[in-house]
């Protein structure tokens, strides 16, 4: 059985009641984070979802309201006892953008990443 947890349902501007978009899908012992808007880590904590439950991250597109939480999330996951391979799926240039995140925020990446660029369609 799938379990969906809406972590954010707002658009570019978060409101008092709604964060920028992010969705957590759990299935058995797997966890998929769909997009990572600003404030996603806080919403994960409120929902009782541990970072270690995230196996895959799906980036639908690279607008800020879907990705501004990603640098902090990756840094927190890298600083934690995260085990296994974190798979990140996204559109063209996802690998390049992830590399830019690590350069821009100057932290030591300890994550084993598998980055897959998905073709349209």
Regions found by a protein language model. Give the residues of each.
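Binuclear metal-dependent hydrolase catalytic cores
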Residues: 1-121
